[in-house]
Amino acid sequence: MASTPAEYIQHHLQNLTYGKLPAGYERADGSILDQATWTIAQTGAEARDMGFMAVHLDTLGWSLLMGAIFILLFRSAAKAATAGVPGKLQNLVEMCVEFVEGVVKDTFHGRNPLIAPLALTIFVWVFLMNSLKWIPVDYIPGIAHLLGLPAFKIVPTADPNGTFGLSLGVFILILFYSFKVKGFGGFTKELAFTPFNHWSLVPFNLFLEILGLLTKPLSLALRLFGNMYAGEVVFILIALLPFYVQWTLNVPWAIFHILVIPLQAFIFMVLTVVYLSSAHEDHGHAELTP
């Protein structure tokens, strides 16, 4: 697939990037663009030069595919649901629903019928995206290489753009429910007078609370990305070893990842529910300390 280990690693860890290169740009093959062109990046340098508007086609495609699989599975189970002896798919879906419902009841202290479906969607979707790591590391990138694609990653959660997209959605929901439940004045007051209930400490409180608010999506995104990306790198490094050594290291690492993949989906879901629960709580404040 690649002539050197560096090319092999680059092919597996670089995303399939589509974006716009400016006129006069010299490409990796030595050709010079006569005009600004939307194209697929051939190297990491080209991907960087495409700038902010570049799109990771592999991350986007696999995310949508896993989302579609989630919808089809749960829709099929719902349509085939019966009061009699349930089938295997119905059993699996009911287990997921009951598990997530129990987590939400224990964690979420407000009243919102949308939180449990949201938590279920996040848990199953992230789990499905993580589970792509169970596919042997060379299979799909190898097919992509035969098709002439310069790079290809199949795990959306090993791409920071994917995890930050998820966490940004959660962050928007946190702000939405904070303003909806507490009102603009109530939410602003909470930021200004927590943790110290004194007018002279409002700037310090705002700094702490806004910083804490911004770290929520950062922690969600970086935790998921860090665990998935690190696992991806280890699998790729193991694949570079001689065949007789690969089994010695790959089997225990794969077994370990059987636990990591659902665990990271669970952590992302629980933290999302915790943050949304906090957004629904109107803490209130006593009279200002003079």
Swiss-Prot record:
SUPFAM superfamilies associated with the record: F1F0 ATP synthase subunit A
Top-level taxon in the UniProt lineage: Bacteria
InterPro entries according to UniProt: ATP_syn_F0_a_bact/chloroplast (IPR045082), ATP_synth_F0_asu (IPR000568), ATP_synth_F0_asu_AS (IPR023011), F0_ATP_A_sf (IPR035908)
A single Gene Ontology CC term: plasma membrane
Record's subcellular location: Cell inner membrane
Chief place of localization: membrane
Topology of the protein relative to the lipid bilayer: Multi-pass membrane protein
Alphabetical list of NCBIfam families matching this protein: ATP_synt_6_or_A, PRK05815.1-1
Subunit structure: F-type ATPases have 2 components, CF(1) - the catalytic core - and CF(0) - the membrane proton channel. CF(1) has five subunits: alpha(3), beta(3), gamma(1), delta(1), epsilon(1). CF(0) has three main subunits: a(1), b(2) and c(9-12). The alpha and beta chains form an alternating ring which encloses part of the gamma chain. CF(1) is attached to CF(0) by a central stalk formed by the gamma and epsilon chains, while a peripheral stalk is formed by the delta and b chains.
Family statement: Belongs to the ATPase A chain family.
Protein name according to UniProt: ATP synthase subunit a
Organism: Stutzerimonas stutzeri (strain A1501)
